Each structure stands twice: as C-alpha cells, then as structure tokens.
Amino acid sequence: MKLLTLLLISISFYACTQTSTTLKVKTPTELILDHAKWQLTQDVNYDGSYRKIDYPNGDVPANIGVCTDVIIRSYRSAGVDMQVLIYEDVKNDLSYYYPIHYKRGTAKVDPNIDHRRVHIIRKFLDKNYPDTKLKSTDEYKPGDIIIWGNWHVGILIDEKVPGTDRYYGVHNIGAGPEKSDFYYDEEELDHYRWKPF
C-alpha cells in the first residue's frame, strides 16, 4: 500500500511540474488565410470550363480552378459554403443577378457555376453585405476580398510586400494560385471585409 501511495504521489508531482500545453483554436479568418496560403503550394491548372459538381459542398477537381475558386475554397475551409449561399440567393432573386436574361425569360439558377462567376460574387456581397464594402486602401487587412471590375477576384493574406505596409494577395490569374501585390490599379479595385461567421 505504501508503494502504491508513493507511486501515486510521484506521478502527481511529475504531472504538476510539466508545463501545460494549450491548443489554440483558430479563428475563421485564420483558417481562411491558412487555406489561401496553402493553395500557393498546389499545382492548379487554370480552367474555367463548365462542370457538373455536387451540391452542397461542390467543387471542381482540386487540380483545376480559376480566381473565384481561390476564394470559394478558402472560405469553405472555415465552414462557409459560398455555393449554397449564392445559389439560394440567386434562386430567390433572378431579376437582380441576371436582369437581361430575366426580362427575356431565359434566366435560370445553376449551382454548378453561379458561385464561380466574379460578377455574381460582387452582386451577392453588394446586396447581402453592403456594410462589408470599404473605400480606403489604408484599411486593407488580411482576409479582405479584392475584386477588379467584373473580371477578377483575390484575397489578402497576412504577409506584407517587402518595404511596404501593403499585404500580398492570393489569386489565380491564369497560372494557378499565386501571391501578388494587388495595389497596381486602385481605381478598379473594390474591397470587401466579408465575415459571415
């Protein structure tokens, strides 16, 4: 009995002397940034061809993608399924998303492609999250979505362009995911801080 008591005391003492390790739970924004940066390590061919995909949580094959797929995949890593959010909104407001086709009676919702179109993402953010649109480039922060016109989109990460206070962005402009300085044409940029979590 004395041996057992001595053993338990020794184990308790040893356990008390060890430094405690706490696991840090990542925020959704940290998950998004980690996934955007992880995409830089992947071999992805630029391919915007139409493909049937699952719904919900559908994605084109991991080895292909376009600029919107960088955003969609990054947000999905934090539990945000843009495919579902955008599909449901487009389905309920075709006249907003496709005004010309709506007038002609040819508008239709498509869960395979709508969320992969830059102009649809822009309209979705403007309509449902107008307070997320920011004006000044001084306000840019990691996790912000940057949209050029209706043709291109990327996301800022937590790495700065050397010698500046500007954050790099991740996008796919034709050669797979890449890290770039996004501030080359500020007049065309729209800037969103979208945190739907």
Tell me the role of every PLM-derived stretch.
Residues 83, 156, 187-190:
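A structural signal for short, hydrophobic beta-strand segments that form beta-sheets
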Residues 33, 91-175:
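...with weaker cross-activation on analogous glycine-rich loops/strands in unrelated enzymes
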Residues 19-124:
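N-terminal capping segments
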Residues 1-8:
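Sec-dependent signal peptide recognition
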Residues 14-15:
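C-terminal motif of bacterial Sec signal peptides marking the signal peptidase cleavage site
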Residues 8, 146-148, 161, 183-186:
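A generic structural signal for short, solvent-exposed coil/turn residues
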Residues 164-197:
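Low-complexity, Gly/Ser/Thr/Pro-rich intrinsically disordered linker/tail segments
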